[in-house]
Swiss-Prot record:
SUPFAM superfamilies: Ribosomal L11/L12e N-terminal domain (SSF54747), Ribosomal protein L11, C-terminal domain (SSF46906). One or more lysine residues are methylated. One of its GO terms (biological process) is translation. InterPro entries: Ribosomal_uL11, Ribosomal_uL11_bac-typ, Ribosomal_uL11_C, Ribosomal_uL11_C_sf, Ribosomal_uL11_CS, Ribosomal_uL11_N, Ribosomal_uL11_N_sf. The gene is rplK. Belongs to the universal ribosomal protein uL11 family. Forms part of the ribosomal stalk which helps the ribosome interact with GTP-bound translation factors. It comes from Cronobacter sakazakii (strain ATCC BAA-894). Part of the ribosomal stalk of the 50S ribosomal subunit. Interacts with L10 and the large rRNA to form the base of the stalk. L10 forms an elongated spine to which L12 dimers bind in a sequential fashion forming a multimeric L10(L12)X complex. GO terms for cellular component: cytosolic large ribosomal subunit. This is Large ribosomal subunit protein uL11. Keywords: Methylation, Ribonucleoprotein, Ribosomal protein, RNA-binding, rRNA-binding.
Amino acid sequence: MAKKVQAYVKLQVAAGMANPSPPVGPALGQQGVNIMEFCKAFNAKTDSMEKGLPIPVVITVYADRSFTFVTKTPPAAVLLKKAAGIKSGSGKPNKDKVGTITRAQLQEIAQTKAADMTGADIEAMTRSIEGTARSMGLVVED
């Protein structure tokens, strides 16, 4: 018989930099999970990724206080900021443009995100990422 699920905990943790301080410690401590065990496992799984990149993670906590976790791809906004070389998006995206990004870069980001996105094809995913870019104040060039 399968283990009984106690809770699902969704967090964004920097790749390779999980530690017991907030947000990890309080979220997992509440559920009675061994925090250091999670930190070691997460850091081992994300050591091949760029350090400091925020990685969404879904932690499944079981009734016996054991856990499993699934890492997702970084948020599209983070990948767009990195590709455009900007620190943050525009406060007024329709008026103030903060940078430019090419369609090739958008397709590259869409392929990175393909595992997590439910789009029908790569073109649909690219258009979705393009919408995110525009809402951040980025100009899309062909």
